[in-house]
């Protein structure tokens, strides 16, 4: 998190943050409503994992306006300074929370298909809860090292000299941070990527031998969305860890690839959507209710289409 983070076009940062906020927030709020409803009716392990992923995305999105204000002010931090390390900590923690939870989902999906009898005999919900706690701990513990280094090593926030939010590390502090970043890239990105790739490749192979076309399409959509997050959103950022370790300094393009990592909050809902046909049905139902509430004329159009197609109109009262 050196000064290279904020070099470049400030309005590019603002535009990307704003786009992610406007697209990601409503989608993740809707996903939260759907998952809470599903867990109340019939708790399933994969839904608990995806609920945690949704909460992680919402934490990032709720603190994203702080970054938007910062970018709009030319990367000057004019807000209470306590929000600087807090927003930064959540910003980086959610990156690795996503990779860990996506990996947990891939394992859950693979086990349910490859070993269905064994899978049904296991207390999956309790295990999913334990896995969720471990994921939160691993991501938080790794990302907290940056801030421990800051206070322990008397690093100075650059706010003290130029009003920005980013840390300026000395050479001895970089000697600690750069290996930690490399370890994060290996343990929290590369290993999860390998596990996820293995699970989904085996899953696709198993389903190709007898599953319905609809189920295969859903799994392929889930695979595509997951790999898009790993390779496009998180791959370049974690590559900067490797480059930084080799060159002994943060690369100048690190700030731009970090922007890509925020896009996962918009792509994660695709993972939710392809996670199950039940989620798709609940999502469509919730979206229909919102449209009827916000745009009343859509209900009349729906009734007219049903009458035109010879269908029986619903007897429900307008919501």
UniProtKB/Swiss-Prot annotation:
Keywords: Cell membrane, Disulfide bond, G-protein coupled receptor, Glycoprotein, Immunity, Inflammatory response, Lipid-binding, Membrane, Receptor, Transducer, Transmembrane, Transmembrane helix. It holds the Pfam family 7tm_1. Residues 1-15, 65-98, 149-183, 240-254 are extracellular. Glycans are attached at residues 154, 162. GO terms for cellular component: membrane; plasma membrane. It is a multi-pass membrane protein. One of its GO terms (biological process) is positive regulation of acute inflammatory response to non-antigenic stimulus. Its main location: membrane. The keyword Cell membrane applies. It comes from the Eukaryota. GO terms for molecular function: G protein-coupled receptor activity; lipid binding. This is Free fatty acid receptor 3. It comes from Mus musculus (Mouse). Residues 37-43, 120-127, 207-218, 276-319 are cytoplasmic. G protein-coupled receptor that is activated by a major product of dietary fiber digestion, the short chain fatty acids (SCFAs), and that plays a role in the regulation of whole-body energy homeostasis and in intestinal immunity. In omnivorous mammals, the short chain fatty acids acetate, propionate and butyrate are produced primarily by the gut microbiome that metabolizes dietary fibers. SCFAs serve as a source of energy but also act as signaling molecules. That G protein-coupled receptor is probably coupled to the pertussis toxin-sensitive, G(i/o)-alpha family of G proteins. The chain crosses the membrane at residues 16-36, 44-64, 99-119, 128-148, 184-206, 219-239, 255-275. Disulfide bonds join 84-165. Belongs to the G-protein coupled receptor 1 family. Expressed in white adipose tissue and skeletal muscle (at protein level). Abundantly expressed in sympathetic ganglia such as the superior cervical ganglion. Also expressed by intestinal endocrine cells.
């Amino acid at each position: 998190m050196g000064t290279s983070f904020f070099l470049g076009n400030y309005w590019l940062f603002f535009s990307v943050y704003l786009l992610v906020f406007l697209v990601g927030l409503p989608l993740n709020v809707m996903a939260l409503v759907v998952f809470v409803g599903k867990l109340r009716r019939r708790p399933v392990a994969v839904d608990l994992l995806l609920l945690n992923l949704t909460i992680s995305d919402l934490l990032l999105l709720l603190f994203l306006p702080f970054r938007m204000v910062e970018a709009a002010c030319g990367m000057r931090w004019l807000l209470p300074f306590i929000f600087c390390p807090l927003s930064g900590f959540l910003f980086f923690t959610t990156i690795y929370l996503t990779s860990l939870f996506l990996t947990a989902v891939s394992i859950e999906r693979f086990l349910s298909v490859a070993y269905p009898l064994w899978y049904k005999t296991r207390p999956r919900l309790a295990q999913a809860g334990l896995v969720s706690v471990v994921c939160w701990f691993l991501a938080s513990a790794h990302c907290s090292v940056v801030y421990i280094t800051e206070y322990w090593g008397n690093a100075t926030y650059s706010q003290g000299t130029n009003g920005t939010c980013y840390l300026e590390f000395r050479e001895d502090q970089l000697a600690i941070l750069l290996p930690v970043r490399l370890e994060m890239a290996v343990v929290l990105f590369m290993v999860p990527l390998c596990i996820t790739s293995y699970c989904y490749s085996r899953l696709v192979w198993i389903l190709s031998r007898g599953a319905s076309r609809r189920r295969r399409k859903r799994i392929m959509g889930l695979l595509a969305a997951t790999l898009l997050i790993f390779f496009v959103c998180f791959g370049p950022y974690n590559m900067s860890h490797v480059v930084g370790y080799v060159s002994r300094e943060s690369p100048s393009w690190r700030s731009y690839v970090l922007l890509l990592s925020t896009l996962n909050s918009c792509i994660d809902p695709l993972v939710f959507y392809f996670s199950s046909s039940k989620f798709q049905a609940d999502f469509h139902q919730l979206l229909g209710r919102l449209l009827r509430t916000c745009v009343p004329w859509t209900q009349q159009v729906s009734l007219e289409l049903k009458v035109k197609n010879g269908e029986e109109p619903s007897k429900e009262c307008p919501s």
